[in-house]
């Protein structure tokens, strides 16, 4: 089984990483004093790679991805995309959340159209309509284009959110437990759809999940976080299965259960969750939550607006 210690200082890079998280720490002030969420996190991501991040609640997974998205800044260290420091949200990175963040009074078509209008304001009406249709078709929602969020299922809402994110034409797609609220069948369907979209669009994907089986099916590498406070990357598992992946073939492979058991041992034996820990989730931040909802709901327009204020 191929694993690596992401904090090993002897690791060297042959060339500049596409996405580089370098010695990142995050500290929040609290009434009881400073609280260190992350400490010394290092991760290099190749262009086109699919990375899943897993760990117990409160280990800083969302905090880490918020720094990649630009919604939050590290207390120490740097996050760089193509060797450029990330200091704010931007159209090269787009997030999809578990709770969809769609505008409920607008149709699926109009929710995606907002993103297309933001990125391609100079294109003709016909060209914009073709782009919206393209992204809705990509996620299998052509027939539901005129339906509003309240008229479609949770899985379809998440498809709209993914289509809207893709319409921004990001280089990095950031997914924060996007399928966590879905039933098992819908979740598996969307996992297959996500892999298809990832392949066809040459995306780099960072995805938070609590589902080891989901991570083993989707990821090139599984990043496993230690517990907080002062969480860091404990180990990274290389997922060896050939692509395109077949779920039945993978689950019949003995290596699948070796990897699964290794990840389970990491999470529930070596880093068992302390139920008495006062911090069950990343520190709440109402201002950050508002920014995330706005960006999710309005796409690039909200990102551009927030970057200016």
Locations of the language-model features?
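Conserved ABC ATPase "signature" region
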Residues: 124-144, 196
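Helix-to-loop junction immediately C-terminal to a conserved catalytic motif
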Residues: 69
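Conserved signature/switch motifs of ABC ATPase nucleotide-binding domains
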Residues: 147-150, 168
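Catalytic Walker B motif of ABC-type/P-loop ATPase nucleotide-binding domains
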Residues: 173-176
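Conserved ABC transporter NBD signature motif
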Residues: 77-89
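Short coil-to-helix segment of the ABC ATPase nucleotide-binding domain corresponding to the Q-loop/switch region
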Residues: 106-115
């Amino acid at each position: 089984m191929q694993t690596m210690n992401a904090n090993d200082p002897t690791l060297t890079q042959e060339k500049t990483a596409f996405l580089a998280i370098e010695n990142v720490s995050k500290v929040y002030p609290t009434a009881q004093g400073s609280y260190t969420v992350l400490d010394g996190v290092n991760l290099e991501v190749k262009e086109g790679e699919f990375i899943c991040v897993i760990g117990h609640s409160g280990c800083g997974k969302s905090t880490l991805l918020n720094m990649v998205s630009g919604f939050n800044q590290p207390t120490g260290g740097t996050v760089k995309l193509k060797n450029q420091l990330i200091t704010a949200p931007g159209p090269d990175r787009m997030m999809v959340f578990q709770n969809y963040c769609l505008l409920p009074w607008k149709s699926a078509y109009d929710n995606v159209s907002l993103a297309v209008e933001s990125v391609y304001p100079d294109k003709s009406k016909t060209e914009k309509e073709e782009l919206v249709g393209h992204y809705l078709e990509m996620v299998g929602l052509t027939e539901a284009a005129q339906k509003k969020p309240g008229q479609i299922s949770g899985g379809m809402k998440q498809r709209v959110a993914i289509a809207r994110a893709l319409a921004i034409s990001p280089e990095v797609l950031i997914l924060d437990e996007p399928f966590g609220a879905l039933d098992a069948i819908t979740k598996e369907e969307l996992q297959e759809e996500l892999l298809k979209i990832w392949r066809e669009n040459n995306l780099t994907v960072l995805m938070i999940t609590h589902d080891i089986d989901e991570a083993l099916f989707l990821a090139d590498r599984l990043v496993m976080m230690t517990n907080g406070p002062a969480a860091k990357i404990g180990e990274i598992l290389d997922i060896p299965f050939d692509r395109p992946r077949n779920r039945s073939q993978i689950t019949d492979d003995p290596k699948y259960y070796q990897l699964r058991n290794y990840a389970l041992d990491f999470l529930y034996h070596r880093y068992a969750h302390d139920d008495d820990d006062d911090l069950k989730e990343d520190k709440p931040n109402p201002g950050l939550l508002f920014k995330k909802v706005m960006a999710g709901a309005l796409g690039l327009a909200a990102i551009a607006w927030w970057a200016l204020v």
